[in-house]
Design a protein with these regions (language model features):
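N-terminal loops that bind phosphate or other acidic moieties
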Residues: 1-131, 135-376
Length: 376
């Protein structure tokens, strides 16, 4: 019997690979002859870079870059051959900004551009970039500046960091952009479809969680429209209504237009890079899961992405989760054959989330399920 194990991380407890290895341990306890293939899974959010880097046996690189408030921070990204695996949140994520200093007028994506530049200097030509969890609403302007694009005011001076820089933006030039960008293929893990501007745009929808008040939201939306109009002078094909343009405070717009990146669901990128489909083709069972299974899981999170791929080849899918919430039955309709809670008995959340406890709970649950599946 062949089993493919593609677990998402149990946030705050186990990484994707750690969760997968725990399940594999349980499966082998049930029957040591079962072949287990553990693959990393992530949906493009926090932990995607670490999961994919570990799963591909890549190298973790640490680099000092400009943080969201202009301070220096240490960012990590993965490298495997000519592939770089990055998360914008490492350089411009909301957790890097204290609650009382959250102000998207000031926060910048400059460090994201520095990460990309560092990876390019290391010889990378293919990029996977997770763009969730941003603290910014600068339309990716900071990233572009770090990559050599000139964003200038009416006097020809570089605009300042943050959305407030877009307020005085009068001209965009690409003649000094990093030449190596022409040879780069970038895929951005993007799970939102918001346009750049308007009531569903980045300022209106995501601005409040980044510290924007109603008046600031209106101002930033106006700045974004000006930015989009100036961009159209340079790139006539650009469109502020492109699905995903509003991702990460407009970073999706800059990536798609200036860097010709492809915006696609994170789970699809991860599954493609790990060649999960090839492994599933030859499997008898597929195992997936995450920390909590609920109605949101069925809306396209990693376990359902795995299940849809397995369904293509008519493979049964078993899911394990730390917690099963109301609405989880929607996962059955989305392709998960059966799901099981991994927590055994009444316990506290802190105890259940201890890595050694979570791993053993997963192993024990997997063992019991596969004892039944291997019954002769």
């Amino acid at each position: 019997m062949r089993v493919v194990i593609a677990m998402d991380s149990f946030k705050g407890s186990l990484s994707s690979i750690e969760a997968g290895k725990a399940v594999a341990e349980g499966v082998r306890r049930a029957d040591g002859a079962i072949e287990c293939a553990v693959c990393p899974v992530a949906d493009g959010g926090e932990g995607t870079s670490a999961a994919l880097t570990e799963g591909l046996h890549g190298e973790t690189v640490r680099v000092r870059v400009t943080g969201p408030l202009g301070e220096k921070v240490t960012a990590e990204y993965g490298v495997k051959g000519d592939l770089a695996i990055l998360e914008m949140a490492q350089a411009a994520g909301l957790p890097l900004v204290p609650q009382d200093k959250r102000n998207p007028m000031k926060t910048t994506t400059y460090g994201v551009g520095e990460m990309l530049r560092d990876a390019i200097n290391r010889g990378c030509k293919r990029f996977v970039l997770g763009i969730g969890g941003s603290a910014t609403n600068d339309g990716g302007a900071g990233m572009l500046q770090a990559l050599g694009f000139d964003l200038l005011d009416k006097d020809g001076n570089p605009v300042s960091f943050g959305a407030e820089g877009l307020r005085v933006l009068a001209k965009i030039e690409n003649k000094n952009a990093l030449p190596a960008l022409k040879n780069c293929v970038i895929r951005a893990a993007c799970d939102v479809t918001n346009p750049l501007c308007g009531e569903n745009g980045c300022s209106a929808v995501f601005g409040p969680q980044k510290g924007a008040a109603p008046e600031m939201i209106r101002e930033m939306d106006g700045y974004m429209r000006n930015y989009a109009a100036l961009t159209k002078n340079l790139y006539p094909e650009s469109n502020l209504d492109t699905p995903g343009a509003g991702a990460a405070g407009g970073l999706g717009f800059a990536l798609g237009v200036f860097l010709h990146a492809e915006l696609m669901p994170g789970i699809e990128i991860v599954m493609e890079e790990t060649r999960l489909e090839e492994k599933i083709k030859n499997a008898d069972f597929v195992v997936t899961g995450e920390g909590r299974l609920d109605a949101q899981t069925a809306m396209g999170k990693a376990p359902v992405g795995v299940a849809k791929l397995a369904k293509k080849y008519h493979k049964p899918v078993i899911a394990f989760a730390g917690g099963i919430e109301k609405g989880a039955e929607a996962c059955n309709k989305a392709g998960i054959t059966a799901f099981f809670p991994a927590v055994r008995g009444v316990t506290t959340l802190d105890e259940a989330m201890r890595p050694e406890t979570a791993a053993e709970n997963l192993a024990e649950s997997a063992e019991q399920v596969f004892r039944l599946l291997t019954l002769r």
